[in-house]
């Protein structure tokens, strides 16, 4: 199946509300678990989540690791609003968590570099994937941990629809539509490997970790 682009920014309030209200606890918790398994002992320093959406992974990382500073970057103001509303009630995280509105490349970040750069479900939104792979070495310090999880494109439209019904059959139609569009906009694992080689990141590992997710992990040179 050929890739079908989708909008890069979820800037409609209803779309953001549907996404923020959906149950992504299982994949988001799995993302945090992948981070902890790939980088055992990583409990201090600064982490940035690129394309953080409503901030669930940002908040999970900060809750699990009290010595971490965690920043979330997204270009959707409605999405960030839902994250900020949750943070407002989490007094123990305030001062360690910050949400930033901005777009890659060139976003104005609170820190010059980060000890870890993570991203979940941003890659498939990007019309030009090199935006992500160029930004990670610019944002992460030498030797920084890198963890990117995203959907991968199924072999056919029928397979994509089956995945939607399996994992989001009970969700609102708006969310099911967006999920299908995201699957169709995602990259195949080998396409991601080609992207990494083109940006000097061929040492990063690419693996499939579910029936719909791929994982890129490793450290920046240095």
Where would I find each of the regions flagged by the language model?
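N-terminal, positively charged/glycine-rich alpha-helical extensions of SAM-dependent methyltransferases
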Residues: 1-18
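A conserved beta-strand element that flanks and buttresses the S-adenosyl-L-methionine
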Residues: 118
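Conserved alpha-helix/loop element of class I SAM-dependent methyltransferases that forms part
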Residues: 25-44
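Core SAM-dependent methyltransferase catalytic element
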Residues: 202-222
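A short glycine-rich, Lys/Arg-flanked "PGG" loop and its adjoining helix->strand segment in the class I
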Residues: 131-142
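Class I SAM-dependent methyltransferase SAM/SAH-binding core
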Residues: 48, 56-106
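C-terminal alpha-helical "lid/dimerization" subdomain adjacent to the S-adenosyl-L-methionine
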Residues: 151-199, 205-207
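Conserved beta-strand signature within the Rossmann-like core of class I S-adenosyl-L-methionine
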Residues: 143-150
């Amino acid at each position: 199946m050929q890739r079908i682009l989708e909008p890069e920014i979820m800037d409609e309030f209803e779309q953001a509300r549907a996404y923020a209200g959906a149950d992504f606890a299982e994949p988001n918790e799995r993302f945090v678990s992948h981070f902890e398994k790939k980088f055992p002992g990583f409990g201090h320093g600064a982490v940035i989540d690129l394309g953080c959406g409503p901030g669930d992974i940002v908040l999970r990382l900060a809750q699990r690791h009290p010595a971490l500073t965690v920043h979330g970057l997204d270009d959707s103001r409605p999405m960030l609003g839902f994250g900020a509303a949750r943070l407002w009630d989490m007094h123990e995280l305030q001062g360690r968590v910050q949400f930033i509105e901005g777009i890659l490349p060139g976003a104005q970040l609170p820190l010059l570099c980060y000890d870890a750069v993570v991203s979940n479900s941003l890659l498939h939104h990007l019309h030009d994937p090199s935006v992500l792979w160029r930004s990670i070495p610019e944002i992460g310090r030498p030797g920084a941990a890198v963890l990117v999880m995203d959907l991968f494109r199924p072999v056919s439209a029928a397979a994509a629809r089956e995945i939607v019904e399996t994992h989001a059959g009970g969700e609102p139609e708006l969310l099911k539509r967006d999920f299908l569009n995201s699957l169709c906009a995602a990259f195949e694992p080998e396409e991601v490997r080609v992207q990494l080689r083109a940006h000097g990141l061929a040492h990063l590992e690419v693996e499939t970790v579910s029936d719909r997710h791929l994982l890129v992990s490793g450290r920046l040179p240095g």
